[in-house]
Amino acid sequence: MITSLTGTILQRRPPWLWLDVQGVGYELEMPLSGFYQMPAEGAALTVHTHLTIREDAHLLYGFMTVAERDMFRLLIRVNGIGGKVALACLSGLPAERLSQAVAEGNTAQLTAIPGIGPKTAERLVVELRDKMGGIAPGPMGRGGAGDPRQEAIAALLTLGYKPAQASQAIAGLADGLGLEDLIRQSLQNLSRH
């Protein structure tokens, strides 16, 4: 799987981004919010990715942060939510507010997103409330690393742990650890309990 790409921006045509990575051009579909954060054409950029392989297409989605990509992966697990609707969700609300709306059961805020009706909003709340309640994406930079603790929490949530479990597992660890060490040690702590 392609987890990230670093290259030069060839074209920005929302929702499409063309990225040149050592002579190979990649076409990525991104949430509209990502285009506000990225530099101009010709600049270097790192994009976190999700690859979907279907019978009729290979689709590469791009995200400015790991937490945003993890949010996308949670969204597409919900029955009736595909890549387009998940991108619409992330375009309509920042990942942190989307997570908060789901955790609070705020279906009115969710139905304000194009493509999300009342039934879909309810389904999002029911299926994701326990998984999304603690996602807090790191700073929305230019694809750089966010807070390793927040990214580790997002990784644990993606693995199916509840927000309280993930936060508690990370809270007890020493400061200054890298992302991989945080995840490894928190998984060891969680397996003991």
UniProtKB/Swiss-Prot annotation:
Annotated region Domain III: where? Answer: 144-193
Task: Name the domain of life this protein comes from.
Answer: Bacteria
Q: Name one GO biological process term.
A: DNA recombination
The protein's matches in CDD domains, at most eight in alphabetical order, are given as:
UBA_RuvA_C
GO MF terms held by the record: ATP binding; four-way junction DNA binding; four-way junction helicase activity
State what this protein does: The RuvA-RuvB-RuvC complex processes Holliday junction (HJ) DNA during genetic recombination and DNA repair, while the RuvA-RuvB complex plays an important role in the rescue of blocked DNA replication forks via replication fork reversal (RFR). RuvA specifically binds to HJ cruciform DNA, conferring on it an open structure. The RuvB hexamer acts as an ATP-dependent pump, pulling dsDNA into and through the RuvAB complex. HJ branch migration allows RuvC to scan DNA until it finds its consensus sequence, where it cleaves and resolves the cruciform DNA.
Q: What is known of its domains?
A: Has three domains with a flexible linker between the domains II and III and assumes an 'L' shape. Domain III is highly mobile and contacts RuvB.
Q: Which NCBIfam families match?
A: ruvA
Q: What is this protein called?
A: Holliday junction branch migration complex subunit RuvA
Gene (name only): ruvA
